[in-house]
Amino acid sequence: MKKTSDGFTVRTETDTFSAKKLILAAGGCAGSKVGGVMDGYQLAKNLGHHRTQLYPSLVQLKTDPTYPRALKGIKAECGIAIRRDNASVAENRGEVLFTEYGVSGPAIFDLSRAVSTGGEGLYCVLNFFPDWDLEEVLHWLHLRRQTMAAHE
């Protein structure tokens, strides 16, 4: 592969192709355990491109395993906030899957970039009752307590 004055030339074992534009689809380094490599980045660099710093995105969030392990396998619709010093860095709402190592699911994937680039001191807050105000949650808990006590 070579950059020319009017585009690019790509040589294979049997042919040579010329084009004004070139699409480089080489994957990335994610999933190195299943074959992800840096070759595409090197090819782009050889053509004069540069890249920004690499960081994980669209990934699960690892947490202290004490908490999610008990909920492993459970899915819940939640409001999710990534916070630092009680200030929101990023928010989302959607399905959260509890795993042995933390939390996953589409809503978590959407927020993972904010965590990857956010630096130190971040924490995740899950709201299991995103449509309820505090009074409604307390009322529901009170009713559940009465129901559970009646079954003892």
Which residues fall in each region the model found?
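An anion/pyrophosphate-binding glycine-rich loop and adjacent beta-alpha core
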Residues: 50-53, 59-152
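Surface loops and adjacent helix of pleckstrin homology
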Residues: 13, 22, 56, 112
